[in-house]
Amino acid sequence: MRRGENIYLRKDGRWEGRYIKGKKANGKAKYGSVYGKSFQEVRSKLYPLKAKYQSIRERQGEASMTYQEWGNYWFTEIKSEIKQSTYSNYEYKLKHYVFPEIGEYSLNELNEMVAQRLFQALKEKKLKTTTIRAIFRIINQTMNYAIRKKQIKENPFLLIRFPKVSRIKQQALTKKDQKCLEKQAMREKKGKGIPVLLALHAGLRIGEIAALKWQDIDFENNQISIHSTYQRVLSSDNISRRTSLIYTRSKTESSVRVIPLSQILKKELLEQQKQLRGRYVCSNNDHPAEPRLLTYHFHRIRRKVHLNDVHFHQLRHTFATRCVESNGDIVSISALMGHSSSKMTLDTYADAMMEQRIQVVRQMEKAIS
């Protein structure tokens, strides 16, 4: 039995009132329901909800598919456009951190209050601010895509303000420590020290070293071509945190670069080439040696020379610092490092330029004296 205003008497004796929450992906209306023992009880519950969702639909649009449904749709749209490692990272962060918190909200129900609650929930999980920022950047991509597809009208997640993060500055090795590490790396058998030398003399990332093939090294023209990386990424079953190794093109166009081959590095690489027959410079049965193995060898080497609290990426940082100390220009150093901009290089290695600053001040003093 029906008595107007979308209120019904059900077979079980209860009254039910329905209100429109928005539209489904297929364009059909999505309804919400309230229940009560009488027509008047249901009516009193129904009117505030009708008004609430009328306001939501006018302000934010008709899309009532859940955020989780939209996120999964977005995954299918972007999968062929981005690297597998990037896709796995996006998928893990949304499925592990975001969907459990806000996945059941309809797109048009998402607002600043929901965004703020998510931010607080992530903080309570003791996540670093940098990680939370990364999660929100992914959410913003999904929401901005929803706006482009005319599913919603605005992105409330852009309203969240994050606390400033004090960047931890990486320390380059001293010249003395660098020499000790290099000497030990050269003494290592079976080429186990080669990754250390590639990082210190060419500024390569660990994944770039793992992917490096002999055909990428031009000994005649003294050049190393960098275009690929070998790394661990989350598998498609990424909720269980299983990983797999993939060989793929470098992360950005700026990461694809040509690096001059130093004479020290050339000598060591030629010796290494005589000992190995595989395609890869750092080989494991004619397969690229995985980054974790290279890192393991590095830690064994640095412990032999009593270097504590040093991680592999500091070797790359040391290479750049030595270039700056040698009065290399920022544009060239940025290109060697594979940075996306010279600003990034300046921001990262500004402290290493103190000697240049001192010289500038001295020149200024001479000019006015």
Each language-model region and where it sits:
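Short N-terminal "domain-start" leader segments
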Residues: 1-12
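DNA breakage-rejoining catalytic core of tyrosine-based enzymes
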Residues: 32, 108, 152-154, 164-183, ...
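N-terminal core-binding DNA-recognition domain of tyrosine site-specific recombinases/integrases
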Residues: 38, 60-63, 75-156, 167, ...
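Basic, Lys/Arg- and aromatic-enriched nucleic-acid-binding interface segment
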Residues: 133-135, 148, 152-154, 159-214, ...
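Catalytic-site neighborhood detector that most strongly recognizes the C-terminal catalytic loop/helix
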Residues: 168, 230-232, 337-363
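Active-site/catalytic core of tyrosine-dependent DNA strand-transfer enzymes
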Residues: 239, 260-308
